[in-house]
């Protein structure tokens, strides 16, 4: 146990699309792994809109969905700007420091229940962009690499063997598609399934 986080006060939340991908099975594997690791008291709840795991104890409400979407927008923006600036920055680490600064700022704002409305986001997005634009860079031609694939493998350094770090060490500009595209894909598929 940690001083910061008690396993008795911890729960895991996993998203499930309800589609045919293997990620829909991860919740069962997580539960088995927690029991095997000695943490049977930690519940694993499912976040989905397709009716899976109806008794998971977690219900998505409209206000919570709005907050989650705002966080995805902010996260996508920070990742995109960081990846556009970092390969060209004059001072190594400046883009990562800017990400950390904005994660801290946004964390305080969001925890205070602000920053979720369209008006607040429209105010904040240009401020974030302005801060990244102020980082001194030297634009030189670089190979641009787009990373696609399964969500976990694409975004997790553990799952992709630190692919972004490797590509950047090879003097590449790395681009990950935003998570919002996946959210839109899931929403569209749900709509299509309903029509069918």
Tell me the role of every PLM-derived stretch.
Residues 1-196:
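An N-terminal assembly and electron-transfer interface module characteristic of large anaerobic redox
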């Amino acid at each position: 146990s940690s001083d910061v986080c008690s396993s008795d006060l911890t729960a895991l939340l996993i998203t499930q699309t309800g589609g045919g991908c293997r990620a829909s099975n991860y919740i069962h594997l997580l539960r088995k792994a927690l029991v095997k690791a000695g943490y049977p008291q930690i519940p694993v709840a499912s976040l989905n809109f397709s009716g899976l795991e109806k008794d998971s104890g977690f219900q998505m409400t409209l206000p919570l969905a709005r907050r989650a979407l705002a966080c995805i927008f902010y996260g996508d923006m920070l990742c995109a700007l960081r990846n556009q600036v970092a390969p060209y920055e004059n001072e190594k680490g400046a883009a990562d420091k800017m990400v950390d600064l904005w994660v801290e700022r946004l964390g305080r704002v969001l925890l205070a229940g602000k920053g979720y409305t369209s008006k607040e986001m429209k105010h904040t997005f240009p401020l974030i962009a302005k801060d990244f634009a102020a980082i001194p860079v030297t634009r030189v031609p670089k190979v641009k690499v787009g990373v696609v694939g399964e969500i976990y493998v694409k975004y997790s350094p553990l799952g992709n063997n630190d692919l972004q770090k490797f590509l950047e060490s090879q003097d590449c500009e790395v681009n990950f598609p935003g998570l919002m595209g996946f959210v839109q894909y899931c929403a569209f598929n749900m709509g299509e399934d309903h029509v069918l």
